[in-house]
Swiss-Prot record:
UniProt binding sites for S-methyl-5'-thioadenosine: 33, 108, 139-140, 165
PANTHER family xrefs: SPERMIDINE SYNTHASE, SPERMIDINE/SPERMINE SYNTHASE
Reaction(s) the record says it catalyses: S-adenosyl 3-(methylsulfanyl)propylamine + putrescine = S-methyl-5'-thioadenosine + spermidine + H(+)
Lineage of the organism: Bacteria, Pseudomonadati, Pseudomonadota, Gammaproteobacteria, Chromatiales
This protein's pathway: Amine and polyamine biosynthesis; spermidine biosynthesis; spermidine from putrescine: step 1/1
Domain PABS: 3-240
The name this protein goes by in its record: Polyamine aminopropyltransferase
GN (gene name): speE
Family recorded in the similarity comment: Belongs to the spermidine/spermine synthase family.
Length: 278
């Protein structure tokens, strides 16, 4: 790290992203990963796990809104939601903006990520004390495998990159377990890296795994996240019946909460397929 800057380099792609920083305000080695928090000059606080940018306060809303609202508005009546990963709690915040959601279970392997977020990113953790929220710190792979069949409406997989402990979240076996836990019309959304950098290494294999797991439809959402490699990110939507392009449009336009990025037009546009992903 050059003095005064934090840099995340993607060596294989010959690209790097840097943020000017004022100071590192927290550092620890948890049981699972190296956790750092920086105060940047213009992007608010920065959360870094094992050297990789997880979020900045300036652009976190882009990722968290798009990982939550398209799936929730695509489901006809989302009441039971599970988040696998999501330790920073930003997706939990967005999910519980929906008044119809009755219960959301967040299953995060590393409790320290959540506790660090509660201390240094309180705006992400505003739903942690919601009576509809349940935080559980355990292995998401095992939890999904043991989940009651047809007990969930929406599953959101907010994992780190598909290496190490997170690699199992991108497999046919895991997605088969997720599909079993979903009720009719159930939806899973999973972060799937950059369309520009990871089309062949992540997105295409995840689509194949989802199809092999028996999902009726597999779709890619694309959206900007400037602090992530390439600045262009994706999530993969997998459905047990239905089509996320046929969403509750009126509800999304009259939602009883404010968003900074997501709306009905963005929902439609994010599901449009660029030529390079066809």
């Amino acid at each position: 790290m050059r003095e005064g800057w934090f840099t995340e380099a993607v060596e294989d792609e010959g690209v790097a992203f840097s943020l000017a920083i004022d100071e590192r305000v927290h550092e620890e080695q948890s049981e699972y990963q190296h956790i750092e928090v920086y105060r940047t000059r213009r992007w608010g606080r920065l959360l870094v796990l094992d050297g990789c940018v997880m979020l900045t306060e300036r652009d976190e809303f882009l990722y968290h809104e798009m990982m939550a609202h398209p799936a929730l508005f695509a489901h006809r009546e989302p009441r039971r939601v599970a988040i696998v990963g999501g330790g920073d709690c930003g997706i939990l915040r967005e999910v519980l903006r929906h008044p119809g959601v009755e219960h959301t279970l967040q299953v995060e392997l590393d409790e320290r990520v959540t506790r660090v977020a509660e201390t240094h990113f309180p705006d992400l953790c505003t739903a942690n004390d919601d009576e509809r929220a349940e935080l559980r710190f355990t292995d998401g792979l095992r939890w999904i495998r043991e989940a009651e069949p047809e007990s969930l409406d929406v599953v959101i997989v907010d994992s780190t990159d598909p290496v190490g402990p997170a690699a199992g979240l991108f497999t046919k076996e895991f997605l088969t377990d997720v599909r079993s836990a979903l009720g009719p019309g159930g939806i899973v959304v999973q972060q799937s890296e950059s369309p520009l950098l990871h089309r062949d290494s992540v997105i295409a294999p995840l689509h194949r795994a989802a199809s092999e797991a028996g999902f009726d439809g597999v779709h890619t959402l694309t959206f900007p996240v400037p602090s992530y490699p390439s600045g262009w990110w994706s999530a993969t939507l997998m459905v047990n019946g239905g089509d996320p392009r046929n969403f509750r449009e009126a509800d999304s336009e009259e939602k009883p909460f404010e968003t900074r990025y997501y709306n009905a037009d963005i929902h439609r546009a994010a599901l449009a397929v660029p030529e390079l992903l066809k």
